[in-house]
Amino acid sequence: MSSRGDWHNGAMFSDQQRHGPLHLPGTSSVGVLLLHGFTATTASVRDWAHAVHEATDDAGAHPGVRVPLLPGHGTRWEELAEQPWQAWRDAVDEQYWALRREHEHVVVGGLSMGGALALHTAARREVSGVLLVNPALSLVNRMARFSHLASPVVASLPGIGGDVKKEDALESTYDRTPLAAVAQLNVLMHRTVRMLPAITAPTVVFRSEVDHIVSGDSADLVAEHSSGEVRVVDLQNSYHVATLDHDAPLLERISRDAVQRFSRGERFLPEDPS
């Protein structure tokens, strides 16, 4: 389901405690950076962030967690249409360096486009681990690759949010998808795929068996081309926005366990993460 309304006056995003940036301070050696998806807000990953924050090291300290609201999100779809992909990258870098000032190790993670940004960061920065939920490296709609040609004449198409199997779950997204922003997402995905061999950190990829937005090829690309250890966890009862779906408790538990391992300086992953 998708929560939509009068996006032009910002009413649907007025609750900053739900849709705005999130910072959960921690004193362990690990900081975690989690990133939301395309046209959505931090609301889609807040429960995931709080679950990860519950991880503890041997001294009982919790990790610090940061969840930024990416440029062009949580306002109007027209504002998203004006953002170059580098604006998203730079916003993520800013939060990465903030965590590096506070913690010895940084774990990056994200949902959908946020997963692509997490991978892009892991290829360029020193990270201790990567957590991905249906990362956007290949889209189900193959026509999306031509968005750069269509955007000058077609500003937007109906929204793509709300791919959740759980009936009472709500994902707050724009009711329109700006094609100019899709074109920028395509650039990000293409560049990220080329950079995958530069990633050496252990990576957990949560992949929904049914995803109407991101192709399952995305997880395969990470597993085949990343230079680090990769574990793919198949989610059998969730659609694209798995952080709000039936399998959320499973991915939260595995993510929390992974962060606890990283806090102890362990870079390996459990043999069976499920």
What is the role of each PLM region?
Residues I199, V205-R207, D211:
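Short beta-strand/loop motif that positions the catalytic acidic residue
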Residues L131-R142:
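Active-site nucleophile loop of the alpha/beta-hydrolase fold
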Residues A11-R76, V205:
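Short, surface-exposed "cap/lid" segments of acyl-processing enzymes
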Residues H212-S218:
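Conserved alpha/beta-hydrolase "acid-adjacent" motif
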Residues Q236-S274:
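Catalytic active-site module of serine/aspartate enzymes centered on a nucleophile-bearing elbow/loop
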Residues H62-R66, D220, E224-V241:
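Catalytic histidine neighborhood in serine/cysteine hydrolases
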Residues Q17-H19, P178-L196:
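Active-site nucleophile elbow and catalytic-triad environment of alpha/beta-hydrolase enzymes
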